C-alpha cells in the first residue's frame, strides 16, 4: 500500500525526494523493480556487489560535473526509462544540489496556441555530448533519433 502511494505521488508530481534517508543497495533495487524492469545506465560502472545499480562518481581530476546542465535522463534512448532512482552516498562539502523542473507543468501553463505549435515539433536526441561514447564501444552516430518533443 505504501509503494502504491509512492507511485501515485510520482505520477502526480513527477518527482519524489526523501531527504536525509539511507537507501541500502538491496532496497534501492527493490524500489526500482516496483516501477518495472531495471535499465542499468550503460555509461557508468555497475556496483560490483549489486550490478543492477550504476555508480555515478566524479574523479578527483574531473573538472565538469556529471549531468551539470539541465537535462532529461535517457532521452537519447529509443524507449527512455520511466524514472531514475538516485541515492547520494557521498556529498561534497558544498554544492551538490540537484534542481528539478516539470516540463509537463510548463507545457500546461502555456496558451493553447503555443501548445499546438509545440505539438508539431520534433527533437533530435543523442548521447554524443554527454560522454565520449567511443571509449565504450558505442558509436554516437548510430544513436541519434528524432522523436516527438513530448515523450510522455
Where are these regions (language model features)?
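Non-heme Fe(II) oxygenase catalytic core, chiefly the N-lobe of the double-stranded beta-helix
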Residues: 1-152
Amino acid at each position: 500500500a505504501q509503494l502504491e502511494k509512492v507511485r501515485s505521488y510520482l505520477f502526480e508530481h513527477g518527482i519524489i525526494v526523501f531527504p536525509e534517508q539511507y537507501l541500502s543497495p538491496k532496497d534501492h533495487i527493490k524500489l526500482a523493480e516496483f516501477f518495472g524492469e531495471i535499465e542499468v545506465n550503460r555509461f557508468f560502472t555497475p556496483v560490483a556487489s549489486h550490478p543492477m545499480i550504476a555508480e555515478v562518481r566524479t574523479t578527483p581530476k574531473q573538472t565538469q560535473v556529471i549531468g551539470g546542465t539541465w537535462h532529461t535522463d535517457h532521452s537519447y534512448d529509443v524507449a527512455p526509462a520511466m524514472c531514475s532512482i538516485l541515492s547520494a552516498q557521498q556529498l561534497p562539502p558544498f554544492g551538490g544540489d540537484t534542481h528539478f523542473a516539470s516540463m509537463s507543468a510548463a507545457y500546461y501553463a502555456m496558451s493553447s496556441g503555443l501548445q499546438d505549435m509545440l505539438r508539431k515539433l520534433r527533437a533530435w536526441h543523442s548521447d554524443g555530448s554527454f560522454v565520449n561514447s567511443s571509449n565504450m564501444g558505442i558509436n554516437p552516430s548510430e544513436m541519434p533519433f528524432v522523436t516527438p518533443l513530448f515523450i510522455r
